[in-house]
């Protein structure tokens, strides 16, 4: 049977499949046609995201049905070394007790005029982990 896969760009892909094909197989066919890796594909039918292990018949997908292809969002956490560097840079500072200005770790007086360049400084508190 023939089904259609519509991408977010509006392009429609035609696939020849069987009702017994798994969603993984459909994603592999999309990869063959479009070059999009299956791990980045999300298929939506009738408002539901299709799971890899299930078949087309499980979702009542019949001939000439249209699936919607959405790509997985990239990104995530920072590399541990970058996270440690950011933590060090943001936490090892001094704070003026009068105007709460953030100052470099070796500062002895505040740089702001509104507190009269106070020498009342404290270390910035460490965030809770």
From Swiss-Prot:
Keyword Magnesium applies: no
Q: Return any one Pfam family short name.
A: ubiquitin
The covalently linked position for Glycyl lysine isopeptide (Lys-Gly) (interchain with G-Cter in ubiquitin), per the record, is 48
- Further details from the record: Ubiquitin is generally synthesized as a polyubiquitin precursor. Some ubiquitin genes contain a single copy of ubiquitin fused to a ribosomal protein.
Q: What is the name of the protein in this document?
A: Ubiquitin-ribosomal protein eL40 fusion protein
**Protein family (similarity comment):** In the N-terminal section; belongs to the ubiquitin family. In the C-terminal section; belongs to the eukaryotic ribosomal protein eL40 family.
Alphabetical list of InterPro entries matching this protein: Ribosomal_eL40_dom (IPR001975), Ribosomal_eL40_sf (IPR038587), Ribosomal_zn-bd (IPR011332), Ubiquitin-like_dom (IPR000626), Ubiquitin-like_domsf (IPR029071), Ubiquitin_CS (IPR019954), Ubiquitin_dom (IPR019956), Ubiquitin_ubiquitin-like (IPR050158)
GO terms for molecular function, please? structural constituent of ribosome
The biological process GO terms on file are: translation
Species annotation: Tetrahymena thermophila (strain SB210)
Q: Which residue windows are coiled coil? A: none
- Where does the Ubiquitin-like domain lie? 1-76
Q: Does the keyword Transport apply?
A: no
GO CC term, one of those recorded: ribonucleoprotein complex
Q: Which UniProt keywords apply?
A: Cytoplasm, Isopeptide bond, Nucleus, Ribonucleoprotein, Ribosomal protein, Ubl conjugation
Q: Where is this cross-link: Glycyl lysine isopeptide (Gly-Lys) (interchain with K-? in acceptor proteins)?
A: 76
């Amino acid at each position: 049977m023939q089904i259609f896969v519509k991408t977010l760009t509006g392009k429609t892909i035609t696939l020849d499949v069987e009702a017994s094909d798994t969603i993984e197989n459909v994603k592999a066919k999309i990869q063959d046609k479009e070059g999009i890796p299956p791990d980045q594909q999300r298929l939506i039918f009738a408002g539901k995201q299709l799971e890899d292990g299930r078949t087309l018949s499980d979702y009542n997908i019949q001939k000439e049905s249209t699936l919607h292809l959405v790509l997985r969002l990239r990104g995530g956490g920072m590399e541990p070394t970058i996270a440690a560097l950011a933590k060090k840079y943001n936490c090892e500072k001094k704070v003026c007790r009068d105007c709460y200005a953030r100052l470099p770790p070796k500062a002895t007086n505040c740089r702001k005029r509104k507190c009269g360049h106070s020498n009342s400084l404290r270390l910035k508190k460490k965030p809770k982990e």
